Every structure is written in C-alpha cells, then in structure tokens.
C-alpha cells in the first residue's frame, strides 16, 4: 500500500483554472495525458475490458463481446450486499478520519512550534507504517489471550465488540486520518485572516469563528482528504481480513479475491467487480466536485496565520494529539515490536519468552536479503524521483487547464486508489505482456521497468492530489502580475510555481519512497524472476509462518525508511536556512548600498 | 498577453523530456531483456530456467540445481494463489518453465486449461512409491514430489489434556470444542479446498455438508487463511484447528505447544506437484530440473529443515528417501482425493461452503 497525504483543494484549483482558461492553450495537457494513459488508463483498460471481452487474453484471442461477467456481478445478491457493506464502512471510516484529521490539524496549529514539529513527525510515521503492521498489531493486542488480556487478565470474549465492523471502522479511521490532517494543515496556513478579523469585529465568539468561518473555508481540504480515506476504506482487503476474520462482513474486495482464487482464475468476474468499484469511487469524486463547485472557496491569503491561544488550551490540545497518536501508532506498532522479540508466538508476554535472535537472524540475511534490500532502495529512489516530477507536471496541468480531458483523467486517477492493489498489478501483466507488443519488442512485463511503472502508477494518484492541492494555494494574482510584467511561462513556473510547491514535491518524494519499500501486490506479481524485492522477502517469511522473523524484517525496513525521511527533513531544513541566510545577506548588502 | 503565453517552451519541454526518457529507458530495457525472459517467442541463447514456486525449499533447490548444472535458475517465490493468478494472467504469452506448489486439484485446473506439458515421463519415475504412483494423473501433466495432509487436527496442548485429544473428525462435534475450533475459508485459502472436498469424499456429499453444518452449529470459526487460524490456536483463542499439517509442523518445531493428530478415518493427500509449461521457453532445462527434484539429491534438499522450514516435514513419495524424523510417518490413513473430480466441483463447492458455513 502506498500511503500518502493529500492537500488537494480541488475547486480552488479549478476556480483559478477557469480564470486562467486562456492562459495556455492548445496541446499543453497532452504530455500529462499520455503519461496517465500509459501508466494507468491502458493497464486498467486491459483488465476492465475483460468484463466485456472475457476472451481478450485467451489463447487464441477472441474479441467476442459478452455481458455474462457483468450479469453475474449484478445478478448476485451477495455482490450487492458486499457493495453496500464496502460503501457504508468506507463512508463511516472517512467521517471518522475527517473528524480525527481536522482535530489534529487544528490542534497542531495552536501548540508551540517545537511540540508541533515532534507531533507532526509522528503523524508522518502513522502514514509510513505499512497497513499490515497496524492491522496485525491490533490483533495481537486485542484478541482473546492477546497482549492486553495477558497483561490485565481479561477473560476470553472481552474484545468481541472490537472484532466487528465498529472495530474495523475505528482502525481504518485511525489509519487514514493523516490524509485529512495534511490536507487541512496546508489549507489552515492560508486561511484568509481578513475574514477571521471581520468575524471578530462583528462580535463572533471563538466557537462561532470556528464553525461559521474556518471550518467552512476548509471544506475543500477535508473533503479531499476524506475522499482518499473513503477510497482507501472502500477498496480495503487486508485490514478487514485481519480485524473481522470471523464476523465475516462480505466486502466488495472479498468478492474480488474470491474470484481470483477460483479455478481457473476468474479475471472477467474480478474485472466486473473492479469496474463497479471504479464507478462508485468516480461517482463519489464527481459528487465532491459538484458540491465544491456550488461554493466559492477562493479565499487564499499569502500570510501564514497562527491562532493565538491560551496556555492551558494549548497544553490540552497537545495532550489530545499525543493521545490520538498513542492509540493510532504506539499501541499497534508497540504490539508488533513485542511480537518481533518473542521466542515463540504462544509464549506471548511471559518473562522467559524474549529474544533478539529474530533480529540477528534478519540481519544475517545473507547475500539474497541484502540484495533485495538494495534493490528495493533503488526502486524506491528512482520511482520516487519520477513520481515527484510527473506529479508536478500533471498537477500543474490539472490546476491550470480546465479541460475535459484533464478532469476525466483526474477522476480516473483517483478511482484507481479504490482498486485493490492485486487487481492493478494483474492489469500490468495483461497490459505489458500482451501479444500485440511482441512484434515491437515492448513486452515490458518481466523487466524492472514494468515493476517501476506499476509503482509509479500506484503512487501517482496520491502525489497528483497533493500537488494539485499545493498549487491551488497559489494566488492567481501573483501569476497574473508576473504575466503582465512580461514573464514567460518558463519563468513563471521556475520562479513562482516551483519554489512555492517545493515542500509538497519533497513530501510526494518521501511518500513514494516509503510506499515502494513496503508495496506488496505489484512487487509480488511483477518482480523480474530471480530478483525479489524487500517486501517480497518479508511476505515470504509471513507465508512460512515465521511471523517474528517477518516482524523483525519489517522493523528493520521501517528503520531504513525513517532514517531516509530524517535525512530528507534535515536536508530541507538546512537548505531553507541557507536560503534564508542568503536572503538576509542580500538585504544587508542592499542597505549600505542604498544608504551610500 | 496571449502572444507571450502561446510560447511555453518550459511547460512543453519538461513533460516531453520526462516522457521521452521513460520511453527510451523502457525500450532499451525492454529490448535488452527481450532475449531473456521477457519475450519467450525468441529462443534464449543463455541456458536458463524460469521457475514459479510456492514451496519453502524452492530457493535452496534452485541454488542446488544451478550449482550442479550451471543452468541459471530465475525463481519467483510466492503463495500458491499468487503463482496461479500470475500464470493465468500470462496465459497468452507465458514466461515460466516450471511451476511447483501444493495441491493437485489446482494444478489439474491449469491442466484443464491446456497449459501443461502432457505425456512426458521423467527418468527414474519407477522410483515413486505406491502412494506416489497413485498421484500421477493419466495424462502425466504433473508429478508429485512430496505429500502432506490437506488438513490434520492441531490441538493446543496447554488447553487440552491428552485424554481430551480428538481421534477422528467427528470428535470435533463434542462440547469440548464448542466455540473452540477454527479452520480456513476455502474461497481464500488454497489448501483448504482439498480438505473440504476430501470430507465429502469419505463421508459422502450429503453427510459431508451436514458435518460442516454441525461444526458450524458447534461454533466453528472460519478465518481467511492459515495465518489467522494458526495465530488463533497459538494465542489460545481456540483449542483446535484443522489446517494443513506442514503448517502445524512449522509451529510445532519452533517450540509452540502443538500436537498434530491424524484422524483415523483418513487425511486427504495434498501432494506438492511439479509441472512443465506446454510452451516452456526453456524446455530442455525444465525437464532436467523436474528430474533433479525427483532424484535422491533433490529430495535431500527438500527434506532439510534449514531449506524448507515447515514445508520440509512432508511424506516422501520416492523410494529410499529418509523422511524427516520429526514428522509422523506411519499410522497415517491417506485418502486420495480425485483431483479431476475435485477440480470439476471446485467452484460450486466453494460457493456452497461460503453461503452455508462462512456466512
């Protein structure tokens, strides 16, 4: 799973976009469109196409259309029930994520800067940690005779309430709130203080300003973050499989997995169900655009705001976020950490059951293990760089070109988030192993390029949303002003757009970097034979019931990722300081010159 | 103003550069590897083997074979479900030479689709034991390299006293196992279907279905895969599970309190089966590899726990092979599940199980 944040304020972008509709013209959005077609639309089409052309990849190939797969999808009552379940869980979980993310973003804007930086970094960690670690951690913690029961002597059945859809919604909400948090955080900095001042002047209280001014102004931000949370929950399989294994809530993705384990693998049925998943997500996104379009959120100001708040209030805010992080991160991660230190799984928390041997074993990976780690680092670096660049280009086009094509592609890329990773990965096999590619030597399946493309395809939607969000913060006036001074577009992008979205670009880089390290479905279906990735290695430990070994490897991978992230943050901080010093130096130089 | 903007060299050049570099990189790499595994249509000059497997000892086997023959083995190791999904997705342009996983009805499914090399006989095939011989299909599309039980009963020895241990499948219906028995969902977990099909075999379809319904009435829990089920047993959430015996053995040897019980009315053969792609890009190497796996040297690699973990606790199907002493070999009543019939009934039986037991 690729984790990422979202700062999309789409309508703002569209609003500016529509004002700048004539800013550029012609074929400007074609390169971005080609990218999205090659990376996302074409592979998805080869898979979804099988819902209508079930023999597209049979041998011999047949283009005979058939409605049978779709009929079987829509004819089954169970599928309908599964869809309703997925929808309701996705919605409930998105609402929770919005509530938690809004709270954490608003709270962090009020706490002292240093505390804020620390808490913010931990929210990033929530973001980075692979979903399976969180899900597994909760199971180890909460199950009968789990860690909590061992520590406190709770009787069997105490946690039955947890392993239901309520627990599922809770865990997903805690897992996905950072999407909302990061979206809101950026938007919060750019709240137009004039409106807040106006509200104060008119005698509005703190609560009124929050509910009547600030939260409504942030609607695009929390809706955008919430929509990613919804798409994630709607397309989830792993967390549901871990948390509700016996309550058995049939979800859309369960139906897709079941058709993938039919014999022979029923790709047309998986395609039919995936098509429904894509359509529902697309509908949700369109609904969101429509909702945002009705209002005007173009209230940007360039001045950063920091709401002055009383000391005790600040402290309670910080404590609140810390408590949220304790539940969302430290409990499940701690449980996994414990498990990676157990001699035997059944021994649990008992005194004699602790060992570091799994770590020693994991570090003695041998040549294969280190090679896999190196390989994954390489994939991570390359795809993170490419994803960052592409998201910049496509995000720029989507923000400043209000063409139908770009809107369609935008909806498509978002819908991809809800498609289960295994389906997207399988679609890459169909797309890049197709017989029509053999004569032109473009069978990329089986090469590192194909895997890298799949990595980019699965991280690009998040990265684009993030860039679009950041670019929607750019006041159109600045661009117009630059224009009327005769600046060319090249200059506008280089001098204005790039510097202003630099932070976001770096975020997308690390998001992709960490996502790729732990990405599983594409890695396992697409890795070139003989060249497994680190995530494949971890999974094979779990497949062979070496859970503690797998947990130890995961922890090692996380340490690598955190180190990379910390290094990146230091670099950003350092370069910002150097820039600031240079600017100060320039100012100092100016003053004597002016005086003399 | 617009005049200025119509010329947007930067905006146009940057994306173009990115695209060009991607396409160039793609083409170069694509062409570079198309002589290898990427385009099986062309003959491979270097001797190599593309090997898809879900067995724990596959990596060690690949290395041993490579050391012996000099043929480079490119391994894809994954769960059976993913291997089959991959093979099926590749079907119009397959890359693999040899596939190896547990479950002859699953392999039979690939054979039914016409993907496997038929009527080829490895040398030394007469070395197969009687059980082994019985597992070779009539069209010789795949060969057994080992046998495990699709399901045995695993009990948590901390939670049950020896006199409470079940002896046969029907003992699991007693109050001792009320709300304390778990198994996997055959719609999601690969080795579980042969177990369900096997119960139908030994009890008869109607009674077999009734048996699972009675288990459900006694509080049977159905988890998605071995992973959840085994953890539930080890954590003490349930007292007994019915899953593949090699998974139980893997936990047992790590020191977890597990006792494996082979029910007296029979356990169902889950052979580890190996097959060659009908259109294998490296056919000669593939045949050589299968023969190596079935040879005493290959079997020795498999039986070493350092290589295969839990998968190494199998019952040999080759004469003269010393089984791993930690695994019970005698006193197991093997019931062969007909893979052709099992493959035919698979989807309808899975659906029945889902609608009546999982739900």
Question: Where does each model-flagged region fall?
Answer:
Chain B
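Short, low-complexity disordered leader/linker segments with a strong preference
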Residues: 1-48, 359
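Immediate post-signal peptide segment of exported/extracytoplasmic ligand-binding proteins
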Residues: 35-50, 63-69, 92, 174-176
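Short, polar/charged alpha-helical segment
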Residues: 50-74, 251
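Extracytoplasmic ligand-binding site segments that recognize negatively charged/polar headgroups
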Residues: 52-57, 78, 82, 95-237
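Periplasmic-binding protein-like
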Residues: 61, 149, 179-184, 211-216, 222, 255-278, 292-318, ...
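A ligand-binding cleft/hinge motif common to bilobed small-molecule-binding domains
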Residues: 105-109, 239-257, 306
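A bilobed periplasmic-binding-protein/Venus flytrap-type ligand-binding module shared by bacterial periplasmic
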Residues: 152-159, 197, 270-282, 293, ...
């Amino acid at each position: 799973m690729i984790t990422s944040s979202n700062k999309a304020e789409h309508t703002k972008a569209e609003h500016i976009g529509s004002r700048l509709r004539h800013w550029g013209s012609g074929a400007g959005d074609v390169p971005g469109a080609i990218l999205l077609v090659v990376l996302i639309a074409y592979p998805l089409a080869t898979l979804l196409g099988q819902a209508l052309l079930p023999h597209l990849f049979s041998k011999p190939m047949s283009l005979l259309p058939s409605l049978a797969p779709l009929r079987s999808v829509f004819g089954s009552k169970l599928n309908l029930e599964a869809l309703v379940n997925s929808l309701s869980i996705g919605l409930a979980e998105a609402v929770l994520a919005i509530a938690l993310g809004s709270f954490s973003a608003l709270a962090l804007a009020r706490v002292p800067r240093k505390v804020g930086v620390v808490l913010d970094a931990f929210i990033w960690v929530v973001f980075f940690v692979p979903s399976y670690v969180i899900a597994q951690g909760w199971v180890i913690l909460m199950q009968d005779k789990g860690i909590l029961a061992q520590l406190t002597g709770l009787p069997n059945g105490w946690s039955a309430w947890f392993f239901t859809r309520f627990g599922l919604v809770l865990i997903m909400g805690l897992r996905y709130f950072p999407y909302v948090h990061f979206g809101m955080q950026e938007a919060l900095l750019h709240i137009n203080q004039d409106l807040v001042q106006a509200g104060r002047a008119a005698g509005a209280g703190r609560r009124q300003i929050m509910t009547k001014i600030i939260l409504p102004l942030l609607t695009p931000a929390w809706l955008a973050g919430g929509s990613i949370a919804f798409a994630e929950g709607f397309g989830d399989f792993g967390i549901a499989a871990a948390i509700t294994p016996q309550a058995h809530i049939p979800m859309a993705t369960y139906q897709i997995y079941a058709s993938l384990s039919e014999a022979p693998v029923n790709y047309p049925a998986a395609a039919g169900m995936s098509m429904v998943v894509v359509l529902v997500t697309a509908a949700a996104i369109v609904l969101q655009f429509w909702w945002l379009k009705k209002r005007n959120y173009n209230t940007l100001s360039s001045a950063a705001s920091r709401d002055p708040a009383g000391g005790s209030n600040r402290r309670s805010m910080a404590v609140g976020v810390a408590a949220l992080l304790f539940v969302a991160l430290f409990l499940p991660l701690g449980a996994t950490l414990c498990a990676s230190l157990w001699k035997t799984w059944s021994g649990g928390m008992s005194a004699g059951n602790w060992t570091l041997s799994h770590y020693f074993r994991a570090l003695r990976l041998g040549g294969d293990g280190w090679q896999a780690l190196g390989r994954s680092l390489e994939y991570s670096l390359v795809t993170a760089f490419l994803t960052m660049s592409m998201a910049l280009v496509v995000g720029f086009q989507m923000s400043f070109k209000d063409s139908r094509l770009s809107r369609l592609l935008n909806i498509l890329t978002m819908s991809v988030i809800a498609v289960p990773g295994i389906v997207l990965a399988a679609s890459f096999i169909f797309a890049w192993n197709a017989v029509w590619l053999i004569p032109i030597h473009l069978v990329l399946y089986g090469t590192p390029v194909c895997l890298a493309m799949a990595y980019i395809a699965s991280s690009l939607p998040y990265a684009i949303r993030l860039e679009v969000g950041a670019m929607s913060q750019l006041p159109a006036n600045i661009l117009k002003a630059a224009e009327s001074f005769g600046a060319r577009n090249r200059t506008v992008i280089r001098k204005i757009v790039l510097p202003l979205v630099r932070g976001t670009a770096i975020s997308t880089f690390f998001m992709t970097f960490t996502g790729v390290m732990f990405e599983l479905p594409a890695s396992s279906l697409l890795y070139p034979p003989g060249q497994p990735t680190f995530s494949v290695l971890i999974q094979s430990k779990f497949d062979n019931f070496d859970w503690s070994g797998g947990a130890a490897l995961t922890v090692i991978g996380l340490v690598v990722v955190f180190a990379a992230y910390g290094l990146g943050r230091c670099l950003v901080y350092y370069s910002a300081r150097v820039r600031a010093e240079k600017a100060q130096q320039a100012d100092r130089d100016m003053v004597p010159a002016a005086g003399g | 103003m617009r005049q200025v903007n119509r010329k947007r060299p930067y905006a146009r050049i940057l994306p173009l550069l990115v695209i060009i570099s991607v396409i160039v990189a793609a083409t170069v790499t694509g062409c570079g590897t198309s002589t290898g595994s990427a385009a099986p249509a062309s003959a491979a000059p270097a001797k190599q083997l593309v090997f898809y497997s879900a067995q724990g000892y596959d990596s060690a086997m690949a290395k041993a074979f490579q050391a012996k023959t000099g043929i480079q083995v490119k391994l894809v190791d994954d769960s059976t479900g993913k291997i089959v999904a991959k093979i099926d997705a590749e079907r119009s342009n397959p890359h693999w030479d040899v596939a190896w996983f547990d479950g002859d009805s699953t392999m039979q499914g690939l054979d039914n689709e016409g993907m496997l090399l038929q009527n080829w006989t490895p040398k030394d095939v007469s070395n197969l034991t009687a059980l082994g011989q019985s597992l070779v299909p009539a069209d010789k599309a795949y060969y057994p390299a080992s046998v495990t039980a699709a399901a045995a009963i695993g009990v948590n020895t901390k939670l049950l006293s020896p006199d409470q241990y079940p002896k046969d499948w029907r003992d699991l219906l007693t109050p001792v196992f009320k709300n304390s028995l778990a198994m996997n969902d055959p719609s999601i977990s690969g080795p579980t279907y042969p177990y369900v099909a096997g119960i139908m075999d030994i009890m008869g379809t109607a009674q077999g279905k009734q048996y699972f319904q009675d288990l459900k009435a006694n509080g049977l829990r159905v988890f998605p895969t071995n992973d959840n089920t085994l953890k539930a047993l080890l954590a003490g959430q349930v007292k007994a599970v019915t899953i593949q015996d090699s998974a139980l053995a893997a936990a047992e040897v790590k020191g977890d309190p597990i006792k494996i019980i082979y029910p007296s009315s029979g356990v169902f053969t889950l052979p580890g089966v190996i097959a060659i792609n009908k259109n294998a890009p490296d056919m000669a190497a593939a045949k050589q590899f299968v023969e190596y796996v079935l040879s005493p040297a290959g079997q020795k690699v498999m039986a070493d726990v350092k290589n295969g973990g839990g998968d190494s606790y199998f019952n040999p199907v080759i004469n003269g092979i010393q089984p791993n002493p930690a695994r019970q070999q005698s006193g197991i009543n093997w019931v062969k599940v007909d893979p052709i019939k099992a493959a035919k009934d698979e989807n309808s039986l899975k659906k029945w199980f889902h609608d009546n037991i999982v739900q």
